[in-house]
From Swiss-Prot:
Residues 11-255 form the Lon N-terminal domain. This is Lon protease homolog 2, peroxisomal. One of its GO terms (molecular function) is serine-type endopeptidase activity. One of its GO terms (biological process) is protein import into peroxisome matrix, docking. The lineage of its organism: Eukaryota, Viridiplantae, Streptophyta, Embryophyta, Tracheophyta. SUPFAM superfamilies: P-loop containing nucleoside triphosphate hydrolases (SSF52540), PUA domain-like (SSF88697), Ribosomal protein S5 domain 2-like (SSF54211). Its main location: other. It catalyses: Hydrolysis of proteins in presence of ATP. One of its GO terms (cellular component) is intracellular organelle lumen. Gene3D superfamilies: 1.10.8.60, 1.20.5.5270, 1.20.58.1480, 3.30.230.10, LON domain-like, P-loop containing nucleotide triphosphate hydrolases. It comes from Arabidopsis thaliana.
Length: 888
């Protein structure tokens, strides 16, 4: 509760825009502007004895006030302060001149306030200082002159509070006694209503009985929501009788609004029966309309829907269909079962972009190249194909370009490339995720006869994006499936065929829609699951995995700034040196893309965020104060500041004044911090050497949906009956490759000195077990043929394979090495694992041009035409055999 205080002759002024602080009210404000922060620092924060500041209402426009007096700043000087030349009695000419200098309209009366709670903070990453201040209004004052002290305003004031003698004299006035009694009666009635409705009000009753009446009016009215004009009116009510009269009027108005709301609720509930419970909200709306004399809501909504349909630009045949549906809707009652479904259908027709298209700007290929280079590092071949696509669109805008399908492992930038195409074309972008879609209705929509029917994802995407010519991304197109509900991939055949998508028919829409203006782009991890007819409608662009050098550049240019921004940090708080990023790439991640790398960087950022947050400190400024709790009330400050305002429950307000500040320190990541946060390294360069430490193990290269990988093959023998066992979750093709490899080795056993005589069986009395580690991962394909032969020769000869050598290739029964796919990804995988030598089929030499030069320069690539060439290079010192090919 506000107490009587003696005001100084000058007060620092904190302006409130369109908001008034009354005596006895408590607010919480957040100061962010330069002027308000400086005022709080100099007048409140830096002073041991917290003084008073003035709260002055300010209008946000240049119009004069109809209540009270508003002032305009001017120019002048007074005792070292830059005066704003305000005098209460200024002439109209002076006001007009001041208005030209500044539009702000300052009220002539304000309220002196004291700080109950004060805290300081630092915004990250900008470093801007902010203050949160809890203020209590004390007493009214009148502004005599308004000036400047640095960036904030100061005013020469006079108090408007009555002396004790004047107050005692007023209390003897019969009119004042009558007004006091009327105010208390009305206020008590309001408190009783609130107590019945909300089970609250006991504390407020105590205030009505204990707080002096001249202070109670301000405190009571401050808790109501009222207009700025009404707030100014209360502030200007210096005379106690006028103040009580206006307060009584406001309290009575609030009481009447509560009673009207109760009347409407009672009227609605009285009309409800058990079968009408579901229409409660609709009945309440009708009752409100009846009170206002307006009961044609449904008719207005239908009319608005009709106007919206007329403005949608539908083709003539579709407009006729829509009119029939609209006439049917007008004949129905809102309670009928089909009313809502018909209305939703018509709203879809009105919302679809039939003729609304993105305004395409003239294609600038140079700008498109710069955009692609800034958003994506590397991928030169892919970028060149996109530029070619854009060049054709520039020369022939209406050309039906191919449907581009980006194929590659996760995390290499397929989706972001599609977004870059949309930006280069100047079109809106919409993404449809097809992963796991097994229902044809997801593409074509559900028929309207079903409950819960809805349009397909294509039509829904066009409705969301709002234009008929967006760039539409069909994401994860290889992840669609099929079951008894249909095949979504087959439904996409019509969508991606330029001859058919002119009149795409969605089952829910039930009218043809032109998709020919849409630019379709697709993404996939693998080509094999895509049906051949659908694959034939798209142009495949392969995105291989990134090299370590490319990952390093991507991390430094894109990932680290993005991760720091997502965690509220900057380079001033966390620094990740290039050497540490390279360490993460080599020892903590082995992937084709960069998602795992980004997750590791995010882990470092989270750890840094914890360390920075722990630097916060608290400084107590005063004692014997209770904790502040109050409901939130919106408010704003003038001069660009931000205010969060709260009205504290009425009563005695003693609060602790505390301050907080943050002092972050920069963190530099080193190897110790890496191991502490990310744990011990997951990979090391000695893995291949450890795995190939014994005979019977070889290193192969395979291709997966996640890019190239290194695959170890282990073989061992035991006493048995000459049988072969295969483990590692293998497919039929790789099992046949293992059988073929064993047959070839048995046939050449004497040539490789694995048997003393040509007719000796190397499997005599023993079994062979071949295992592919990582047994939880399915494996298949013919490219492990040379790896299997090498492992078997190593087993039988007891000669270890070189640990720095990996290989890939299919072999025939006659020992020829056939070409395989995924050469670039496989070489990149070998580079990631620290492999120094790679054996490839000779006919794959043409694929080496796609491998980055930096990777090729760090590897020794050996081309093999026959299996003998592979074995010669797989073992240290070569693999001796007889120079006899008579069995070939």
């Amino acid at each position: 509760m506000a107490e009587t205080v003696e005001l100084p002759s000058r007060l620092a002024i904190l302006p409130f825009r369109n908001k008034v602080l009354l005596p006895g009210a408590i607010i919480r404000i957040r100061c962010t502007s330069h002027s308000s922060v400086t005022l709080v620092e100099q007048e409140l924060w830096q002073k041991e004895e917290k003084g008073l500041i003035g709260i002055l209402p300010v209008r946000d426009d240049a119009e004069g006030s109809s209540i009270g007096t508003m002032i305009n700043p001017g120019a002048g000087s007074d005792s070292g302060e830059r005066s704003l030349k305000f005098l209460v009695g200024t002439t109209d000419a002076q006001k007009s001149d001041a208005k030209d200098q500044q539009d702000l309209q300052w009220h002539t009366r304000g309220v002196a306030a004291r700080a109950l709670h004060l805290s300081r903070g630092v915004e990250k990453p900008s470093g801007r200082v902010t203050y949160v201040v809890v203020l209590e209004g004390l007493s009214r004052f009148n502004v005599q002159e308004l000036g400047k002290r640095g960036p904030y305003s100061v005013a020469r004031i006079t108090s408007l509070e009555m002396t004790k003698a004047e107050l005692e004299q007023v209390k003897q006035d019969p009119d004042f006694v009558a007004l006091s009694r009327q105010f208390k009666t009305t206020a008590m009635e309001l408190v009783s209503v609130l107590e019945q409705k909300q089970k609250t009000g006991g504390r407020t009753k105590v205030l009505l009985e204990t707080v002096p009446i001249h202070k109670l009016a301000d405190i009571f009215v401050a808790s109501f929501e009222m207009s700025f004009e009404e707030q100014l009116s209360m502030l200007d009510s210096v005379d106690l009788k006028v103040r009580l009269s206006k307060a009584t009027e406001l309290v009575d108005r609030h009481l009447q609004s509560i009673r009207v709301a109760e009347k409407i609720t009672q009227k609605v509930e009285g009309q409800l029966s058990k079968s009408q419970k579901e229409y409660l909200l609709r009945q309440q709306m009708r009752a409100i309309k009846e009170e206002l004399g307006d009961n044609d809501d449904d008719e207005d909504d239908v009319a608005a829907l009709e106007r919206k349909m007329q403005a949608a630009g539908m083709p003539s045949n579709i407009w006729k269909h829509a009119q029939r549906e609209l006439r049917r809707l007008k004949k129905m009652q809102p309670q009928q079962p089909g009313y809502n479904s018909s209305r939703v259908y018509l709203e879809l027709l009105a919302d679809l972009p039939w003729d609304k298209a993105s305004e395409e700007h003239e294609l600038d290929l140079k700008a498109a190249k710069e955009r692609l280079d800034s958003d994506h590092y590397g991928l030169a071949k892919v970028k060149q194909r996109i530029i070619e696509y854009l060049a054709v669109r520039k020369l022939k805008p209406d050309a039906r370009g191919p449907v581009l399908c980006f194929v590659g492992p996760p995390g290499v930038g397929k989706t972001s490339l599609a977004s870059s195409i949309a930006a280069a074309l100047g079109r809106k972008f919409v993404r449809l995720s097809l992963g796991g879609v097994k229902d044809e209705a997801d593409i074509r929509g559900h028929r309207r006869t079903y409950i819960g029917s809805m349009p397909g994802r294509l039509i829904d995407g066009l409705k969301r994006v709002g234009v008929c010519n967006p760039v539409m991304l069909l994401d994860e197109i290889d992840k669609t499936g099929s079951d008894v509900r249909g095949d979504p991939a087959s439904a996409l055949l019509e969508v991606l065929d330029p001859e058919q998508n002119k009149s795409f028919n969605d089952h829910y829409l039930n009218v043809p829609y032109d998709l020919s203006k849409v630019v379709f782009v697709a993404t996939a991890n693998r080509v094999q699951p895509i049906p051949p007819p659908l694959l034939d409608r798209m142009e495949l662009i392969e995105l291989p995995g990134y090299t370590q050098e490319e990952k390093l550049k991507i991390a430094m240019r894109h990932l680290i700034p993005r991760v720091l921004d997502q965690h509220g940090l900057s380079s001033e708080f966390l620094k990740i040196p290039e050497a540490m990023v390279k360490n993460i790439i080599q020892r903590y991640t082995r992937e084709a893309g960069v998602r795992s790398l980004e997750r590791n960087l995010a882990a470092l950022a989270r750890a840094a965020a914890v360390m920075v947050a722990e630097h916060e400190q608290s400084l107590p400024l005063s004692k014997d104060v209770q904790k502040l709790t109050s409901p939130l009330l919106n408010g704003r400050m003038a001069e660009g500041g931000e205010v969060e305002m709260e009205v504290i429950p009425m009563g005695v307000n003693d609060h602790e004044i505390g301050g907080t500040f943050q002092s972050p320190s920069a963190l530099v990541v080193d190897e110790t911090m890496l191991e502490k946060i990310l744990g011990p390294p997951r990979f090391d360069d000695s893995e291949a050497a450890d795995r190939v430490a014994s005979a019977g193990v070889s290193v192969g290269l395979v291709w997966t949906t996640f890019g190239g990988e290194v695959q170890f093959v282990e073989a061992t023998s035991m006493v048995g009956k000459g049988e072969m066992h295969l483990t590692g979750q293998l497919g039929d093709v790789i099992k046949e490759s293992a059988q073929l490899a064993l047959t070839w080795v048995r046939a050449r056993a004497s040539d490789f000195k694995l048997a003393l005589a040509g007719d000796m069986n190397v499997l005599d009395g023993r079994d062979i077990h071949i295992h592919f580690p990582a047994g939880a991962v399915p494996k298949d394909g013919p490219s492990a043929g040379v790896t299997l032969v090498t492992a078997l020769v190593s087993l039988f000869s007891q000669k270890r394979v070189r640990a720095d050598t990996a290989m890939t290739g299919e072999m025939t029964l006659r020992g020829l090495v056939l070409p395989v796919g995924g050469i670039k990804d496989k070489i990149l995988a070998a580079h990631r694992y620290g492999i120094k030598r790679v054996i490839l089929p000779q006919r794959n030499s043409k694929d080496l041009v796609e491998v980055p030069a930096a990777v090729l320069s760090s590897l020794e690539v050996i081309l093999a035409k026959r299996m003998e060439d592979v074995l010669e290079n797989a073992f240290e010192g070569g693999c001796p055999w007889r120079n006899n090919y008579s069995k070939l």
